[in-house]
Amino acid sequence: MEVLFFEEVRNLFKHCNENPSLLEGKYPEIKDRLSKCCGKGQGTGNKATDHEASFAKIVEDCGFMHIQVGDQITKLSYIYQPHGTQKSIDFRLVSPSGKTIDIDLKHSENDAIFLNDGKFLTDVIYVISFTRVLKDEKVKGQRKCPRQNICTIVLGQDVMTPKDVASLEKRYARLRELNEEAKDLDFLTIYARNANQYSCKQFTTEFNTNSLEKTMTFLQ
């Protein structure tokens, strides 16, 4: 069963990488089903997105069954938002033997994704889908440049450069200091948060090929 599990997971990520347009679909029934796992909050953060529903469709087409946290695992399955909404890890793939793979989705209609207060986590597989504008392929007389859907499959530890990691950690250390200072107030509440973005320009064809190979090795 473990061999089958990792084989299906590898096939899943290869399929996403080779067919990025599949992550742009509309599956309202799946979206509604996933949203029911998010609680009763009214904000958009408590609702599944079209992007997440598209990924769930791909996962289900690869033979994984949607289950809830605490359900008995009798076959290849997946859990949506295993840690709750607004937290890292969007999907967890699980096998009856107890093996798990954690996945986080990042999606953008341009060439940058939002990290906000988050960061790329070690041994989490990121499915980063975005749209690249092909400025060099613009047709004369047309106002808009061609656009290309791209899906990067990458382990969290393989994303950021050492320079960027050091800068982000320094930033978090400063935020912790600011939040400690904010505790010693009378009536004022101060929030020190991030609104960080990450450029998709890093995700070249060469980067995507190498990161997919590293992910496949991780899944052996």
Please name every model-derived segment.
Residues 1-89, 93-101, 107-220:
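Nucleic-acid endonuclease domains
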